[in-house]
A protein has these predicted regions:
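Bacterial Sec-dependent N-terminal signal peptides
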Residues: 1-31
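Secreted/extracellular ectodomain signature
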Residues: 30-153
């Protein structure tokens, strides 16, 4: 069947404005490769690194997760050298810890590490919670269905 050239022009006349209207949306979708998932994910992160850059990185990782999973529940369990993140005298990310705990994130200090290093609750940032054992806390969270990750070296 033969179609008239003007009918093709009419189709283009209609389709081109629609295509141009969609271009910004398509470009934005392509640039934003983050997948937003509103499910309530639960993540427990082991942090045992005393490096100051690692302290900042672990707090940045929270932001990375929350950009994709805004309803995620996150707990950072600090042990060994990672306890420095929660110490008032050594933390390089105390502002970030305060900001994230205000948004519901949990920063837990291992009591066994505290005893071994002669650290008291008063030595910690006010936002820190103390758990009896980092390993027990991590295992308990995993048994409750939390995903486990390790940050730092």
């Amino acid at each position: 069947m033969f179609s008239h050239p003007l009918s093709k022009m009419k189709k283009l006349h209609i389709l081109l404005p629609i295509l141009f209207a969609l271009l910004p949306i398509l470009a934005t979708a392509q640039q934003n490769s983050e997948v937003i998932d509103l499910k309530k994910h639960k993540i427990v992160i082991q942090f045992a690194d005393n490096d100051s850059l690692a302290q900042v990185r672990v707090t940045q990782q929270i932001g990375n997760v929350l950009r994709c999973w805004p309803n995620a529940e996150i707990e950072i369990v600090c042990l060994a050298g990672g306890l420095d993140l929660l110490m008032t005298s050594k933390s390089k990310a105390s502002k970030e810890v305060a900001d994230w705990t205000a948004k519901g994130m949990v920063f837990a200090a291992c009591n066994n590490t505290m005893k071994n290093r002669n650290i008291t609750k008063e030595d910690l940032l006010s936002q820190a919670v103390v758990v009896p054992s980092a390993i027990v806390e991590l295992a308990t969270k995993q048994e409750q269905g939390w995903s486990y990750f390790r940050s730092g070296k």
